[in-house]
């Protein structure tokens, strides 16, 4: 099973696709999301969101926001989000 992931910033869709795992920093600490995860609404803190797919990882830097999980769909909403070269990595 895979996760359907969408990462959006206030002004644009940053990334979307399938993933096997999502790891993010929340106000309650780091959280890992796998297929079948219980529904969740989390508050993100500034840091990295790692989206792992088959053979590749997408690393995004967010300034905070929200993470929603429901029925193997993960939606990450941030005021600003940058992926890869955009994030200064």
Predicted segments with their positions:
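Compact, glycine-rich, soluble single-domain proteins
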Residues: 2-89
